Amino acid sequence: MVKCKLFFWLISWFLKVKNVEKVWKFLKSCPENCYSDPQFAFIGRSNVGKSTLINALANKKIAKTSTKPGRTQLLNFYKNESEKLFVDLPGYGYAAVSKTKKHQIDRIIAGYFQKDQPISAVFLILDARVGFTNLDYIMIEYIIQQGFKLHILANKIDKTNQSTRAILLNQCKKLKLNCLLISAKNKNNLSKLQELLE
């Protein structure tokens, strides 16, 4: 009887350990793509909430966030519980960085989106309060030209009204792009995003 209880306790402990292992984790930061496995890319202007979204999907803080734009300046790689790769790219369009740093970030982004990269889909994140900017349109055109599947994530919808959200959806419709209104902070519509990541 004691041996039987011990056996079941060991099985229970083993399953708990396996479940603990199956969580999101940070892998590494690189100036270029250092993995050949299929991956989902998150890109957007500085301070739109890319890192916050990674944390919301992971249900824990694995990506460093800051109220100051320009925190992410390398490719940050993560792996989820299903062993899928996610890439948090540097934010573009932040004016308060040196010209040298800006060129460096541009090179990292351009280098990542080469046509031979193993990218399953790109998620371009907007601040829903601001909407599309000229830089966003340029980035959208570039990603499409490179042949990658593109989705628009309008983040921070918890800080917008119905009229603003309707305008965003109409703009996406004109661009013929799939658009999902989300809030990384409140986790609004994250379940729908999870479906896109399957």
Swiss-Prot record:
GTP binds at residues 44-51, 70-74, 88-91, 155-158, 182-184. The keyword Cell division applies. Residues 36-198 form the EngB-type G domain. GO terms for molecular function: GTP binding; metal ion binding. Gene3D superfamilies: P-loop containing nucleotide triphosphate hydrolases (3.40.50.300). Its cofactor is Mg(2+). GO terms for cellular component: cytosol. Mg(2+) binds at S51, T72. GO terms for biological process: division septum assembly. Pfam families: MMR_HSR1. SUPFAM superfamilies: P-loop containing nucleoside triphosphate hydrolases. Keywords: Cell cycle, Cell division, GTP-binding, Magnesium, Metal-binding, Nucleotide-binding, Septation. Coiled coil: none annotated. Belongs to the TRAFAC class TrmE-Era-EngA-EngB-Septin-like GTPase superfamily. EngB GTPase family. Necessary for normal cell division and for the maintenance of normal septation. This is Probable GTP-binding protein EngB. It comes from Mesomycoplasma hyopneumoniae (strain 7448). The gene is engB.
